């Protein structure tokens, strides 16, 4: 999300919301993207209108000023989604109004989370999270296992290709059931748990504490007893 010049006649600040132009930090205004689920486009449009109506400033990474940085939407096979708003601060103006708009735009949303990110860089995810409404995690099914996913936990964005990728990795590994397998940067444990039936022991390592919490719970929920996770 970026502010552009005051050039539309009424002193209004037009908000650009979309994706980066290749090899730049310039945001290209995007109303629809065929690569994302419809609920992501709907959430982005609701935030766009909220910013216009309440003059909420988009973040400018050149100056470190402005509030809204990113709209982060994670969806599952049931069409449900978890929405996270990444902000340069602790609060948004008129938070309750924004929550209602997002719930109307995305009726299958399970939760809306605010993430604080005051870093002066282009890292997307935040340092702290606060649930504005609903759940703080989303459930999804991958490789026949159910995973609970918090906002900071890494998860493959293309579920169908991830399943093919994991199957090919297992094939190439040629495990006999006697190995100890180390999964570095394991996120919520998706690859670790996919490998578990084929190895004696699987170990996942990750620097994000929330992801390790998710991975441990996912192992327990799926009845995987030979997996351990470390942060």
Identify the meaning behind each predicted range.
Residues 64-78:
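Short edge beta-strands and adjacent turn/loop segments
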Residues 29, 73, 79-88, 146-150:
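Short, aliphatic-rich beta-strand segments
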Residues 12-58, 78, 92:
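Extended interfacial segments that mediate partner engagement and assembly in macromolecular machines
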Residues 18-21, 86, 215:
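Short, acidic/hydrophobic/Gly-rich beta-strand patch recurrent on exposed beta strands
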Residues 1-14:
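Single conserved hydrophobic/aromatic residue that forms the stacking wall/gate
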Residues 94-231:
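Rossmann-like S-adenosyl-L-methionine
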Residues 12, 46, 50, 70, ...:
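Peripheral terminal and linker regions in Fe-S/redox and tRNA-modifying enzymes
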């Amino acid at each position: 999300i970026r502010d552009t010049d005051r050039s539309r006649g009424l002193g209004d600040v037009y908000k650009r919301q979309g994706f980066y132009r290749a090899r730049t930090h310039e945001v290209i205004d995007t109303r629809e993207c065929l690569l994302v689920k419809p609920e992501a486009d709907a959430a982005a449009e609701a935030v766009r209108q909220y910013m216009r109506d309440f003059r909420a400033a988009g973040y400018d990474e050149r100056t470190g000023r402005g509030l809204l940085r990113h709209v982060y939407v994670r969806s599952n096979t049931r069409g449900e989604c978890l929405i996270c708003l990444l902000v340069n601060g602790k609060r948004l103006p008129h938070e309750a109004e924004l929550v209602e708009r997002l719930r109307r735009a995305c009726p299958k949303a399970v939760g809306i989370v605010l993430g604080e990110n005051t870093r002066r860089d282009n890292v997307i995810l935040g340092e702290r999270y606060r649930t504005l409404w609903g759940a703080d995690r989303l459930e999804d099914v991958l490789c026949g296992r159910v995973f609970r996913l918090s906002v900071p936990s890494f998860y493959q964005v293309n579920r169908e290709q991830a399943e093919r990728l994991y199957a090919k990795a297992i094939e190439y590994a040629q495990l006999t059931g006697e190995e100890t397998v180390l999964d570095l940067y394991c996120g919520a444990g998706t690859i670790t748990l996919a490998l578990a039936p084929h190895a004696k022991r699987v170990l996942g390592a990750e620097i994000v504490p929330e992801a390790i919490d998710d991975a441990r719970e996912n192992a327990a929920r799926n009845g995987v007893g030979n997996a351990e996770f470390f942060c």
